[in-house]
Amino acid sequence: MQIENHKEEVPFSYYENLFRDLSPEAALQRLSSVKWDGKEFYVNLLGKTYGISHPDYAIRAVDGSKVPTLPTQTFLLRYLLEAKEVSWQGQWKTFREMPWGELYIKPYTGRVLTRAAFTFGTRVQKFKEACEKMGAIPVKHGDAGYQFDLVGGYQMQILVWEGDEEFPPNAQILYSDNFAEGFAAEDRVVAGDILISTIKSFM
C-alpha cells in the first residue's frame, strides 16, 4: 500500500501486519464479546457490527453500510490485538483521572472536549435527536447527556452544556472505570473521537 497520509496510514499498516499473526483463540480468550466464525471476527462498536477477516485483513459493516474511517479501523485492530475485558465497578472517570491522563490532557481537550462542545453545545436539540436515534440512554447531567455502549463491556457518557452570552458551550466525556486498565491513553482519546464523529453522522 502506498503511504500518502502518514498520520493515519502508517499506524494502520503497522497493526494490519501484526493482525496477520494474531491467534483467534487467544483473542477470544481475552474478549468474550467478540465472535469468530473461522473466517471473520465480529465486533460491535457503538451498536454497529463489523466483520473483520483474518488473517488477510478486510472489514465490512454487517448491515451493508460504509466501512469506518482508517483511525476507527486502527482502533478496532488494536482492540483485537491488545484489549482485554475488565469488569466495570460502576464508577465513572474523566480522562484526566485515568493513567497518563494528566500528560495527555492538553491534546485530549482540544481534540475531544472542545470539539464536542462546539459541535453539540451549539445544537443541543440536534444532539439529543442524534443520540436517541443511536439508542443511547439519557443521563441527568449537563443540558443534555447520554450513555453509550462503546465496545465489549466499555461504556461512555457524553455531557454537553449550551453556551450563552457569558459562557461558551462546554462538554465532558466520562469513561466507565474499566477503561483505566483495559485501554491505553491513546485509545481513550480515539474512543472519544469515534463517539463524537458517530453522533455527528446522525445529526
Give the label of every model feature segment.
Residues A27-P55, I137-E162:
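Amphipathic, interaction-prone secondary-structure segments
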Residues M1-K39, P71-T72, L80-M134:
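Short Lys/Arg-enriched alpha/beta "domain-start" segment
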Residues V67-Q89, S176-M203:
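Ampiphathic alpha-helical segments that act as solvent-exposed interaction surfaces
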Residues G121-E181:
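Conserved binding-pocket/active-site segment within a compact domain
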Residues Y50, Y104-Y108, V112, A116, ...:
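Domain-length accessory/inserted modules outside core catalytic folds
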Residues V62, K66, A117, A144, ...:
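Short, charged/polar micro-motifs that form catalytic or ligand-binding hotspots
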Residues M1-Y15, G38-E40, D56, S65, ...:
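Charge-rich alpha-helical segments
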